[in-house]
């Protein structure tokens, strides 16, 4: 798409008006880009922290691997994940709310005694995993918005 110049007073006034608008809005767009860059950096650090925590939790329970063979994984399921929307640096982003789990009743007399602790462990692991995935998705949204804003600055 080539820019066509017209050498008349009206088109010159239109170009000057567009230039003034771009010059006036450039500091705002640069500030938005900077805020988005900071948010991306912060979110990336949060994702790394959550992934490290998840790996640490999994490593801590490696000794119980043989016991998990008798555990019924259908005892606990994620029922719902609450989301809300929040505007951060001019971008609408989802915010993670509560995570609701459905725990199927089981007999504490017939089941092994560690199943209650196993359910809590699975809740913890699922919560950390969902939070990490959610933060990763949030980081992708922010990075996309940052790239678009950078394109506007570079115009």
Locations of the language-model features?
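Charge-rich amphipathic alpha-helical interaction elements
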Residues: 1-155
């Amino acid at each position: 798409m080539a820019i066509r110049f017209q050498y008349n007073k009206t088109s010159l006034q239109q170009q000057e008006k567009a230039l003034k608008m771009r010059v006036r809005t450039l500091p705002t767009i640069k500030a938005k880009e900077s805020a988005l860059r900071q948010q991306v950096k912060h979110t990336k650090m949060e994702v790394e922290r959550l992934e490290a925590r998840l790996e640490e939790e999994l490593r801590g329970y490696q000794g119980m691997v043989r016991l998990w063979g008798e555990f019924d994984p259908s005892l606990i399921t994620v029922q719902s994940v609450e989301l809300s929307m929040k505007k951060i640096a001019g971008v609408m982003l989802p915010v993670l709310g509560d995570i609701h789990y459905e725990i199927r009743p089981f007999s504490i007399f017939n089941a092994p005694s560690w199943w209650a602790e196993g359910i809590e462990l699975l809740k913890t692991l699922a919560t950390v995993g969902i939070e990490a995935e959610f933060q990763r998705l949030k980081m992708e949204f922010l990075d996309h918005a940052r790239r678009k804003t950078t394109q506007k600055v570079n115009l």
